[in-house]
Amino acid sequence: MRQSSKAASFKEASDDLEALAEVSISPTHLQRLSERVGKEWAQQRDREVQAFREDKLVCAYAAAPPAAAVMLDGGRLQTRAEDGGRGVQEPAWRENKVACCLSLSSTEQAEDPQPEPPSKFLEAPRVARLAAEVKSRGRPALGRAEAKPAASAKKRRRKKRRRPASKKRVRTVVASMANSETFGWQMAAEVKRRGLDRARRKACVCDGQQYNWTLFELHLLPWGFIGILDFVHLVAYLHDAAHAWKKDRGRAWKQYVQWLRWAWSGQVKPLMASLRQATSDLGEPPQGAADSDPRQTVKDTLGYIQNNRTRMDYARYRRLGLPTSSAPVESTIKQINRRVKGTEKFWLDGGAEAILQLRAAYLSEDDRAATYWARQRPYARAVGAGRLRAA
């Protein structure tokens, strides 16, 4: 099951098992086994969710971690009609939702441990690449076409790496094709099972998607979690807006750096005031303006910050030893996407949900898969039983 959930396809998993373990199992048979086990694990998850909703879920850990973080995001995969016969009928892109639940080791400090922005946010080529990657699924970016890393014959001096304010202890993963409401309960049950709700310092780090913050306010805010806007997504917006406002590249970069420093230190008021000035200078975008229209870019950035201004006190978050980046969940989604996303992959809903449960279990660092295997499995007819004729 591990290789079935990790390899890029059932065919690749079948080949790996043949080559590495000398186990011969067809891709079709492996798919059936994976769907069956994945559905069993989904049923176990649903039982835990029901126990949580009935206030009967038992925490699996005696001691609470010193700090915790929950990070939410979504990936994408393609589905097809359930009863469409052979071939792909009614293909559609669907979102799979993912949560990373992290216990952290960190300390609270009286002063901001890193008052200056990291160098990666102050180097134009790196920022351009970073912004392009973050916004690649959205509108075309301004000021990026010429942004290429400068060639240099000299090797850069190796900089002393700053130790992160918080260090991950254990990661567990929740992934599902369910709607937002159902997924919210799945995420909350995992937080409760891990005892992350009892951490003294805890954060929910997300990008600006509204449904993420709806789940935060419903499930995590009552437990005292602090909502934090992912700083890297904010950098992408600031980079785009600066190049939309200032046509000269040098002036645009200078404007971006000023906005970056305000954002890094949590000074939201001057940042919003400057963006309002940019909006006034450029004027309102016409109805139906393209996302790449400079007026629309600046307006979108101002709206993004207005909607998330209460989640941008970054200096305070660093003092509390909390993360300000949702990179762990984005990395997890890349690992999941390798298995489920592709132009040639079209899933039925049940198959997608099953493989997500397998992938989430094996990506979790609490031996969840081993725990599931140790439980008595429900009786079911063997996969492939009755297919052989009597002699």
Identify what each model region corresponds to.
Residues 1-391:
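Catalytic center-proximal scaffold of phosphoryl-transfer enzymes
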